[in-house]
Amino acid sequence: MAFHKPEQIAELVIEAGVQKVSQTLPAMLILGFLGGAFISLGFLLNIRVLGNLPERWGSLVNVLGGAVFPVGLMLVVLAGGELITGNMMSLSMALYAKKITLVSVLNNWVWITFMNFVGAIFVAYCFGHLGGLTEGDYLNKTVAIAEGKLHESFGRTLILAIGCNWLVCLALWLAYGTSDFVGKIIGIWIPIMAFVVIGFQQVVANMFVISAVIFAGHLTWMDLARNFVPVFIGNVIGGAGFVGFAYFACYQKQHSNMK
């Protein structure tokens, strides 16, 4: 199993950021939809597991649910998809390296965020609502998860979102660190399970679960909008700052000197 050094990973992430802004609009839209749908499918799997577990199991319930959630990001990385939270890291690093412009970054972020939302809505409505997978016996659990995302203050929600994308982007960083299929799965699985068990907030996952509850007749689109703002900002800080800027500052200059 081959591993890249951190300075090599930094270069790979920057190259990925350049490639992402070079995609055609149709490709960007399709991959953005898939990214949102894949993350939502991972969350749907999480809900189906949690809904059958007794509450008396305590924290073990969250661990088991968190163990299956990473399927979503595995599909994004291994099958192909664009996820806004990952792009917050890769495009920011390419911007820091002066390989792309701020306009191209914002253009990508807007389209990918929108299409991630479309993908999340698709899974929430078609599979969650029409298919009944987040309703019936699973509705109480779905509502509890969604309401848990909404009861925190703006500031606390933002902080929880920072922690989330710190771990999500570390998962992607580890995935860039190896070309081995199994290595990528392991690298993704551990940090993503951690963010779910801890209770951090990820903007695309929240799009799915809150929308599912809206379609079931609970909550409103304004609830989703109020949650979106602090979570998106926090995810940007976690991805572009705590991972992207931190590793660019430490490794990119060193790698450039080596070349």
UniProtKB/Swiss-Prot annotation:
Catalytic function, reaction form: formate(in) = formate(out)
Kindly list the residue ranges recorded as spanning the membrane: 27-47, 67-97, 109-130, 158-176, 188-216, 228-250
Q: Which superkingdom, per the lineage? A: Bacteria
Describe its membrane topology: Multi-pass membrane protein
Query: Does the keyword tRNA processing feature in the UniProt annotation?
Result: no
Which Gene3D superfamilies does the UniProt entry name for this protein? Glycerol uptake facilitator protein
Q: Which GO terms describe its cellular component?
A: plasma membrane
> Its function?
Acts as a formate transporter.
Which PANTHER family does the record match to this protein? FORMATE TRANSPORTER-RELATED, FORMATE_NITRATE FAMILY TRANSPORTER (EUROFUNG)
Question: What is the name of this protein?
Answer: Formate channel BtFdhC
